Swiss-Prot record:
Recorded GO CC terms: ATP-binding cassette (ABC) transporter complex
Protein name: Nodulation protein J
Domain ABC transmembrane type-2: 25-251
Lineage: Bacteria, Pseudomonadati, Pseudomonadota, Alphaproteobacteria, Hyphomicrobiales
Described purpose of this protein according to its UniProt entry: Part of the ABC transporter complex NodIJ involved in the export of the nodulation factors (Nod factors), the bacterial signal molecules that induce symbiosis and subsequent nodulation induction. Nod factors are LCO (lipo-chitin oligosaccharide), a modified beta-1,4-linked N-acetylglucosamine oligosaccharide. This subunit encodes the transporter.
């Protein structure tokens, strides 16, 4: 187990050293977009929408954007960064000559992508607290929700990257899966309730669960209940890594 953890740390460190050269652009890119949405939609529509759940629309939107920033950063790193290292630049293929297991390498990649998501989500949370849309104390309490979302979507995007034959699939994945999930999970508008089947499915969406939990913390001051969900996310990530490792090994050995 110790050797495996050393591998995870080595992959994480390698990515961190590479990321350090482009850290400013990466962080700004992950943070500016949700802040633009916050001002554009939150302040703009806030003049039209009186309130949502008893709060201003900007406050309602801020809670969701914290988590979508974590989701987007994790997705982007996994879909483009990890995919390139596996299939384009040959990083993984080169590392396989060393005594390294593909699944251990992928765990390191998932941890790195999740870390980027946590960084992006935390920065957006701090910015929204500074602007007065969420209480400053709540930033600490919503960190588990940010980590939960980052883990779930980094491991999901790993499987998408593993099966993809090119970058074109990523745009399809974003359009057919991520965008509807954002709109239906209560990020921009209250949760969709127009159809019982769809509403029931959204109720179990990880993004909806996390957004709902963050709003409970921010609105009511209740402690986060994300502990069991974090354990579930670790189990889910393990399954995604196992499946992705099988797919990648087959493709690299062709």
């Amino acid at each position: 187990m110790r050797e495996r953890m050393v591998t995870w740390a080595a992959v994480f460190q390698r990515n961190a050293m590479s990321w350090r050269r482009e850290m400013a652009a990466s962080v700004l890119g992950s943070v500016i977009d949700p802040l633009i949405m916050l001002f554009g939609l939150g302040v703009g529509l806030g003049k039209i929408v009186d309130s949502v759940d008893g709060r201003s629309y900007a406050e309602f939107l801020a809670c969701g954007l914290i988590l979508t920033s974590a989701m987007s950063a994790s997705n982007y790193e996994m879909l483009y960064g990890t995919y390139s290292r596996i299939y384009v630049t040959g990083t993984l293929k080169s590392m396989r000559y060393a005594p390294i297991c593909v699944s251990d390498y992928l765990i390191g990649e998932v941890l790195w992508a999740a870390y980027e998501g946590v960084v992006a989500g935390t920065i957006v949370a701090v910015c929204t607290a500074f602007l007065g849309y969420i209480p400053g104390w709540s930033v600490i309490y919503i960190l588990p929700d940010i980590l939960f979302v980052a883990l779930i979507f980094s491991s999901t995007s790993l499987l998408v990257a593993a099966i993809s034959r090119g970058y074109a699939l990523f745009a399809f994945y974003q359009s057919i899966a991520i965008a509807p999930l954002v709109f239906l999970s209560g990020v921009i508008v209250p949760r969709f309730t127009g159809n019982d089947v769809i509403s029931g499915m959204i109720h179990f969406s990880p993004l909806y669960r996390a957004v709902n939990d963050v709003r409970n913390v921010v609105y009511e001051g209740r402690g986060t209940q994300v502990g069991p969900l974090l354990l579930l996310s670790l189990l889910y990530a393990s399954v995604m890594v196992f499946i992705s490792a099988k797919v990648i090994c087959v493709r690299l050995d062709d």
